[in-house]
């Protein structure tokens, strides 16, 4: 693979979070696990986020792959912005090169509850797929599968949006969606349709099929 090729997996994430990363890091509490280093507003949050990331990495790898992932050569930095009314979202970036994947970085934001039960599982699932396949997945499959591990409240949003998009002609034709290698300008239908299709396939074959 082209040594210059890098692939960032980006979930819905306000640009403001990326601009705040440096300021958050300056006043953040730190916590380290085997595979993650966490910067969060408080020591307790940093520990909760790090421990949840490790648990999700272990449990979700078993669900999807049937086995745990080996330890990464370098830990993935997690930058967390946590506030009660902050919209949930995250962005995970990494690099594919020569059949290897490395350079993990994760930015997450939201309320404590949504970070722990939705954002972290979603972003960790991206890293599991990247570690296993070592090449980019179709956008619909990657994002669609990752949304299936979120909290029921987030899944319900995807299902409501799917109906809305189909009724308002914002849906994406399947032949276009299957061919997408980048995010479309109107990205929310990709998430909703990807979730619906991934959910259907999982119900038919299971996660490890």
Task: Specify the residue positions occupied by each region the protein language model found.
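Residues on a specific face of well-ordered alpha-helices
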Residues: 123, 143-147, 196
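Bacterial N-terminal signal peptides
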Residues: 11-22
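Short helix/loop segments within enzyme catalytic domains
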Residues: 149-173, 201, 206-209
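An active-site-proximal "capping" alpha-helix that borders the catalytic cofactor pocket
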Residues: 60, 141-152
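N-terminal secretory signal peptides that target proteins for export/translocation
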Residues: 1-9
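Juxtacatalytic substrate-recognition/specificity segment
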Residues: 27-138, 155, 171, 180, ...
